Amino acid sequence: MNALLAVLFVLCWSSGFIGAKLGAGDAAPLTVLTWRFLPLAVALALAAALFGRARWRGLGSRAFGRQVTIGALSQTGYLLTVYQAIGLGVSTGTTALIDGTQPLVVAALAGPLLGQYVAPRQWWGLLLGVAGVMIVTAGDATSASGVSWWAYLVPFAGMLSLVAATFLESRSPTDTDPVVSMTVHCATSAVLFTALAACAGQVSPPPTASFWWSVAWLIALSTFGGYGLYWLVLRRSGVTRVNALMFLMAPVTAIWGAVMFGEPFGILTALGLLLGLGAVVLVFRAQPRGRGAGTVPTDEQSPEPEVVRGSARLRR
């Protein structure tokens, strides 16, 4: 995987936690999410109508429905829980920590669902990464005051929603143009968030420059950057590698928080960052490049003589 894409993905994805906190100071989570996706969906739909009709010709009703479901899980389900957790008082670092356990869940399910088996060295890397993200926010949950224990389950539900979307995309029988996918996902989220905000009476945006700054931040960095690069890296490198990068989200989010909000950045955060980097190195070195890398030897990936990686789509 291109190292530059990996760095950009980590920076842009982690910026979403900061954008959520920026927006939370001016409006309810549903208001922020509605205005994050409404203008974006309109712009993408207009661009598709004017310049991208050819991209949509091969998209059947079944593939369209699948992309709607992926968008609902990966954007609406995931983002709503992240924003609600931060709104309930869970820190950005702890929210990123819970998000950082995603690679372990993906690794456990990748074999039975996709035929992508995790090597012994990769398991060590995954465990090292979990240790890193736990160290980053050690004591945060116990030191936080006024936050209910169940609030920490909210981002966990969002993480599972993103995992479900990832596997649904990876098991898709046909490839969908990335621009088409992005448009469908954003339009789906715009409709769902607007409907939820209307029911809650939270559609109207506040007339403040800081609100629109947070919206611009979320559209440019988090949606086009983080979300778009997530699917690009997934297609290029597979679920294990893209999710290994999630180990870096908690420490990088902590760096964002220190720079943007003056949140403390101490020795534990630095140690967690180093462990996360070590985890990514272990996972990447133990896995062949590419999404459908063919077969892998016994000592690298599995006790079986050979394991064919990927679903029918991944092997194409």
Predicted regions, residues:
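Helix-helix packing/entry segments at the starts of transmembrane helices
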Residues: 33-35, 94-101, 167-191, 220-259
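Transmembrane alpha-helices of multi-pass small-molecule transport proteins
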Residues: 25-77, 103-110, 160-168, 182-201, ...
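Specific alpha-helical transmembrane segments that line the substrate/conduction pathway
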Residues: 31-42, 74, 79, 83-117, ...
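C-terminal-most transmembrane helix of multi-pass membrane proteins
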Residues: 37-38, 138, 211-213, 247-316
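Hydrophobic transmembrane alpha-helices of multi-pass small-molecule transport proteins
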Residues: 44, 109, 118-140, 159, ...
